[in-house]
Amino acid sequence: YLAERGVDPVMFNTYGSRRGNHEVMARGGFANIKLKNLLAEGKSGGWTRDFETGEITSIFDASQSYAAAGVPLVVLAGKMYGSGSSRDWAAKAPLLLGVRAVIAESFERIHRSNLVGMGILPLQFHEGENAETLGLDGTETFVIEPVDFGTGEPSMPNPREVNVSASKQDGETVKFHAIVRVDTPTEGAYMAHGGILQYVLRQLA
């Protein structure tokens, strides 16, 4: 992206130095070279399969394809999703890529909170369940039951569970309950408004 705009490679610098440029940071989402996406057929790094075309492509390019088709995205993850050096862009980039929910075995504490701040729904498998035990491989189409966070005031109790169904390409449907990891009434208010920024702006209006 930078090279196409005439930036010399020696001037690329780090993602941290480009954190004010959402175009760069969105492309940096899930770009760690050690990332292992089981949809990428063994390729490490920021790759995935674009089910609109069937091709293995960059996560950013696939996200643009899904956005054009009006398809919101779900991340299936394992334990302690979001672990590592805490960065706000770890939640901002998935939002820009079209991620609307993350279903994981567990979450790193700060990252879970940051997901809520971005309006991304964190869902947790029940103890003893995960993508493998449920037979999920990421090729499914997911339907998450609408979660009612009330009027958007930080006084309503949050729903504790939600029904999820995953339809496989062969027609089989896997249904399970997920724990809603929106842990406080204030977080519920953020989710009701679509994120913390929208919540704050509406409080000022």
Regions found by a protein language model. Name each.
Residues Y1-A205:
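Fe-S-dependent hydro-lyases/dehydratases of central metabolism
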